Amino acid sequence: MTDRTREPLAVEGGRPIRDRFLVFGAPDIRREEIEAVVRTLEDGWIGTGPRVAEFEDEFRRYVGTAHAVAVSSCTAGLHLSLIALGVKPGDEVIVPSMTFVATANAVVHVGATPVLVDCERETMNIDPSAVERAITPRTRVIVPVHFAGRPADLTALEAIARPRGIRLLEDAAHGVETIHRGRKAGTMGDCAAFSFYVTKNVITGEGGMVTTGDEEIASWIKVAGLHGMSKDAWKRYSASGSWFYE
């Protein structure tokens, strides 16, 4: 058996380990999905419209939450959720050290400070004891990530956050089908952001969804996601009336 640990790396002229290109994202797209996309193109509703509303309703019912709001990405969902939860410049938001950069970037986007804490070796999820040690008077939100679909310990995090008035925002980018003690991801925090990027197990190419049980949060995110316009896009051309600008 050849000892390949002594060979030079492929970038240095050595023999590549793989003979075929490793595809970054390989979604299972079948005829049903292709036909659904074609129907959407033929209908003319390429952006926010009836099919998006249908998707929101189906996703809400699947997760088991009161509200689901479609957004352009999970990153946008995290960003909007942080604002909806009242995070402002100077505040601190606790995030895990093992996560995609968007988790921390969303915090930076609102002018707050991401505080990275250690993860558990066994689960790769945020360590509740590390979270508790990192809390300061400026802590406003904790953002647990369900890493690789394994649920973060929301029970422990709730016990830490709720008595202190700290909000919980689930980064559920990996969290479709994730369940923690009988509760689905997207129902355990104040709100949650899901990803439908090409590498996820439910995809829309790009795209995301925010779920919440709070009607005020859902309404704000829906309006803010449409640049503050308060009339649903698909109602502009309906019998309910014309589009008005103020």
Model-flagged regions — what are they?
Residues M1-I46, P50:
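N-terminal "arm"/small-domain region of PLP-dependent enzymes with the aminotransferase-like
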Residues G49, T75, S97-M98, P151, ...:
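Alpha-helix N-cap/helix-start capping motif
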Residues W45-E92, N105-V110, V115-D118, R183:
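Phosphate-binding glycine-rich loop
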Residues I83-A172, I179:
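PLP-dependent aminotransferase-like
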Residues G175-R181, M188-E246:
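Active-site region of PLP-dependent enzymes
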